[in-house]
A protein has these predicted regions:
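Residue-level preference for beta-strand/loop junctions
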Residues: 156, 194, 249-251, 302, ...
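Outer-membrane beta-barrel pore domains
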Residues: 27-39, 50-82, 92-99, 105-106, ...
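Glycine-rich, flexible loop segments associated with nucleotide phosphate handling
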Residues: 214-219, 243-249, 266-272, 359-366, ...
């Protein structure tokens, strides 16, 4: 869901060294013999020399000693693998692994650690030209690798893995209730600790390096925690958010299958199901992000789509995407569905917004399209990705945003890079909060009264109405412009510092609940103890120009310190 609560107004995932962006899976390395392969670079100093497996075996000196080091018991292997990788920038490297990317493909711009991805994110497809099946560095998969189940999963490229992500924040906001930090996201309640997300994936990646056969893949994901409120689609377990406003809940942000056809140009990927909206720098799943909190720009745009999207690499540098879906944060079970209008137009309570006896349950659950192009140059160090996502008639819906934007990445050297995003998004025909008729409906029936999103359909977190220029029109078009950037400095393979400036313009207040221009300046540190354990402390200053948007509308600024721990398994 791309709103915070009206009262105050995130599976690609990284695991361990992979950190595959939900919006663009990273570059997995080839599969190894007893455990899943890894996507991150091997730790510095790793050797392929033949060192005897005597005494305390060192898999970093001799990969063949990995089994001897880990032992046979799955529980022993599990905790020893954490110990093995502690202080390392990657797992042991198999010298006999097949190539992990297509010959002549642009350079891999980043490594994980310390970044949340290795390839510049584009989403909508398992990364073409750089992905091998079974390529996640997972302590759980390593633990069960020598069992019957583990051998079967490894043989066929299946993996089960995930992470646990608790977090906290200290805020200058004194309104300590759900939504008290709004419109700041992913730190929903001021001055508290929370379980952000527990995530479990079942994956099979199609092999996009090979060129000799059609391959297939899938992802089944589940999330539990506070962050469910940002991924919720209307019609899929949405009662937790829209009826009860539960602090913690569950969701299934990615449920899709893929088919990879290597012979079409440089590779064609077809994905069908529920998937993360394209393109975006940030993503719902914690390991796919530089920082713990998210920009307002990201928090209030598209999150997921249900449909079919195709990604075609025309050349190794140029790719195009086209997709058809049912709106944004919309589900097929709501498409074209009509429900009874409990408050049709009447003399006692005029309702010109929805005068008929029925209306669409979600007017935004209609056929929509996505079109994107991506170009990479400078041998992989520059990348631009313009997109139009979730495009239809733009009628006011649960989250029927018409998104037009672009992402851009540039690597200066091995220590510095930046990521930039800009977009315009809008919805049409949003009820005007300044109009007397709309005000009368809201007074008599509650928020969004007389619409598909008022009582009895939604008790909490319904989409905002608009603060139009004047009180005359019944409806108006609401738009927002967002722009954010991450400037990143990595002094070594286990640390990265991110500076995030942002401007978000919400003139009708439909996205945030308060019509204002928002400015943000945040800085964060990402420190990896190993490819499996990461901490992300940060501090951010937010300011609203034109209205008091923070602390329940009493202040025009807020200062928030926050952080989390991501523990992969």
């Amino acid at each position: 869901m791309h709103r915070l609560s009206k009262s105050a107004v995130i599976i690609s995932g990284v695991l361990g060294a992979t950190s595959m962006a939900a919006v663009a899976q990273t570059t997995p390395a080839p599969t190894i013999s007893i455990a899943p392969a890894i996507t991150s670079a091997p730790a510095p100093g790793a050797s392929t020399a033949s060192v005897p497996c005597t005494g305390t075996p060192d898999p970093y000196a001799n990969y063949n000693c990995l089994d001897a080091y880990l032992g046979d018991n799955p529980f022993t292997r599990f905790y020893r693998y954490y110990g093995l990788e502690m202080g390392q920038a990657g797992p042991p490297s198999d010298p006999n692994a097949p190539p992990s990317r297509v010959d002549g493909w642009p350079r891999t711009p980043q490594t994980t650690p310390p970044m949340p991805f290795t390839e510049w994110p584009y989403g909508g497809a398992t990364a073409i030209g750089v992905t091998r099946s079974g390529s996640i560095d997972s302590p759980l998969m390593t633990a069960i690798a020598n069992t019957g189940l583990g051998r079967w999963m490894n043989e066929y490229g299946f993996q089960v893995y995930g992470w646990i992500d608790p977090g906290f924040n200290f805020s200058s906001n004194s309104l300590r209730k759900p939504g008290g930090n709004a419109p700041v996201s992913y730190a929903y309640i001021p001055n508290t600790a929370q379980l952000d997300q527990v995530v479990l994936y079942l994956d099979r990646f199609p092999d996009t390096v090979q060129k000799d056969h059609i391959d297939w893949g899938l992802r089944l994901s589940a999330i539990y925690g506070e962050n469910y409120r940002y991924t919720t689609s209307y019609g899929l377990a949405s009662y937790q958010l829209l009826k009860y406003n539960a602090v913690n809940g569950y969701d299934f942000p990615m449920l899709y299958g893929e088919v990879y056809i290597p012979w079409v140009a440089q590779g064609l990927m077809l994905r069908a199901g529920r998937y993360i909206s394209v393109p975006d720098i940030e993503a719902q799943l914690a390991p796919n992000n530089y920082m713990y909190t998210h920009s307002i720009t990201y928090a209030l745009d598209n999150y997921t789509n249900e449909g079919l999207i195709g990604t075609l690499f025309v050349t190794k540098n140029l790719s195009i995407q086209m997709g058809v879906e049912i709106g944004t944060e919309a589900t097929f079970n709501n498409a074209w569905k009509q429900v009874g209008n409990p408050n049709p137009n009447s003399a006692a309570l005029p309702n010109p917004l929805y005068p008929g006896s029925t209306f669409a349950k979600d007017p935004g659950a209609v056929p929509s399209y996505t079109v994107c192009a991506r170009y990479t140059w400078n041998d992989g160090w520059d990348d631009i990705n313009p997109c139009a996502n979730g495009i239809n008639g733009g009628q006011w819906g649960y989250n029927n945003l018409q998104w037009y934007g672009v992402t851009y990445y540039h690597k200066f050297n091995d220590h510095w890079h930046l990521a930039f995003e800009f977009y315009d998004e809008h919805e049409n025909g949003v009820p005007n909060l300044k109009n007397p008729t709309v005000q009368a409906l809201n007074t008599a029936l509650g928020a969004d009264g007389g619409t598909p999103f008022g009582s009895p359909f939604m008790s909490h977190n319904a989409p905002n109405e608009a603060q139009c220029k004047t009180s005359t029109p019944l409806r108006c078009n609401a738009y927002a412009i967002g722009s954010t950037m991450y400037v990143n400095y990595s002094p070594d393979p286990l640390n990265n510092f991110s500076f995030r400036p942002e401007i978000y313009y919400d003139p009708q207040g439909q996205r945030t609940g308060t019509a204002a221009t928002y400015y943000e300046f945040s800085i964060g540190w990402q420190h990896w103890f190993s490819p499996q354990i990461e901490i992300r402390p940060e501090v951010g200053y937010y300011h609203s120009n034109g209205a008091n948007a923070f602390n329940g509308g009493t202040k025009n600024w807020t200062l928030i310190g926050a952080g989390d721990v991501i523990w992969h398994f």
